[in-house]
């Protein structure tokens, strides 16, 4: 892993088992290994590539005890999939155990367009690169406008209550 993690702790086995029971499957080995010491960790500023035109960063890894409730906020994810990280701008990274624990990107604006990021959680962690916001140099006039979906604030309020 190329980035530092802060504030994580070992997950309780009972919380891992409760999630596995709710999902009806075992959590992938690479994710379980991560949970042994980094449950709920916050990574240093980072970036990962979604596709040739887009990138994102992980804000926090979701504590295993909260995953099942957070899963209810995601539309169109497979039955044995579950969110493991909050990505920037209200998006998520999730794992799908029906696909051998592969990691996917879920975009709240395009929930039907799920993007595969890596074949496993461990491989996803290897995609995370340190990021320094000072490395971004915008040219005058480069940003013409920005837009936020009107329902986004309501989504965040609903999400934070769970």
Where are these regions (language model features)?
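Aromatic side chains
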Residues: 31-34, 105, 121-124
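Intrinsically disordered, low-complexity regulatory segments enriched in Ser/Thr/Pro
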Residues: 101-109
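A surface-exposed partner-binding patch
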Residues: 1-94, 142, 150-162
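Short acidic-glycine loop/turn motifs at beta-strand connectors
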Residues: 96-99
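Compact, glycine/acidic-enriched structural inserts
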Residues: 109-137
């Amino acid at each position: 892993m190329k980035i530092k993690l802060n504030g994580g702790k070992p997950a309780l086995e009972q919380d891992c088992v409760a999630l596995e029971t709710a999902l009806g499957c075992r959590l992938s080995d690479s994710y379980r290994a991560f949970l042994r010491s980094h449950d709920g960790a916050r990574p240093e500023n980072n970036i990962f590539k979604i596709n040739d035109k887009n990138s994102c960063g992980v804000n926090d890894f979701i504590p295993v005890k909260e995953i099942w409730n957070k899963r209810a906020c995601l539309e169109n994810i497979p039955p044995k999939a579950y969110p493991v990280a909050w990505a920037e701008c209200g998006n998520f990274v999730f794992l799908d155990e029906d696909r051998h624990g592969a990691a996917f990107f879920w975009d709240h604006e395009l929930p039907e367009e799920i993007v595969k990021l890596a074949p496993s959680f461990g491989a996803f962690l290897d995609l995370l690169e340190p990021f320094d916001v000072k490395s971004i140099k915008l040219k005058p006039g480069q940003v013409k406008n920005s837009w936020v979906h009107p329902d986004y604030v309501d989504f965040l309020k609903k999400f934070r209550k769970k």
